[in-house]
């Protein structure tokens, strides 16, 4: 449900996290494309700025409401909504960030619990993600980029690193345009990448946090 995913993104005050936990060395990202790729990065792309009221509104409109008064929202059918979150074990700042994520989500009425109750050692984390562990609903990860921002290597239908396993005809069509000879035209290439960045924001199958 894109409304649920967007709500989870709007609930996070990642700019504050970057300032307080990383001494201002990391900042909130507005796009799945990083500013390093200045030719195609869209600085005007709408991002998920901290907006808990908007997050609550999205959940209300989508039918995720607190029907029993315990402060936590239920599924649309009234059943308990519990979301399992997986995150890597890293440094002390990351541990604090993970706990803050859980708190921010609780503030908008979402019951999000850590998978196994704690963060996961790096290799085990990726083993579970690659194995499509059915108990993991959401995960926090990161990646490095080369010198080509083409998204097919991360989000293509058969991409090895498409850990989100999210594929739909619209996204596939945009990626094909980015990889087409038509994209040799600089203006077209910029247009296609802007389309991709907006698509990722709207679907929110992945949402960027810190860069």
Question: Where are each of the predicted segments found?
Answer:
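Ligand-binding clamshell of periplasmic/extracellular solute-binding protein-like
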Residues: 119, 136-151
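Append "and occasionally in soluble cytosolic enzymes with long acidic Gly/Pro-rich linkers
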Residues: 1-103, 195
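Loop/turn elements at helix/coil->beta-strand transitions in domains of secreted/extracellular proteins
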Residues: 1-5, 13-17, 80-82, 107-112, ...
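Extracytoplasmic/secreted cell-surface and envelope-processing proteins
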Residues: 93-96, 123-125, 148-151
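Short helices/loops that flank or line small-molecule/ion binding pockets
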Residues: 2-3, 99-108, 122-136
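Short, solvent-exposed loop/beta-turn-alpha elements that line the ligand-binding surface or hinge
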Residues: 1, 38-57, 67-81, 127-134, ...
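Extracytoplasmic/peripheral linker and loop segments enriched in polar/acidic and small residues
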Residues: 6, 18, 111-124, 152-211
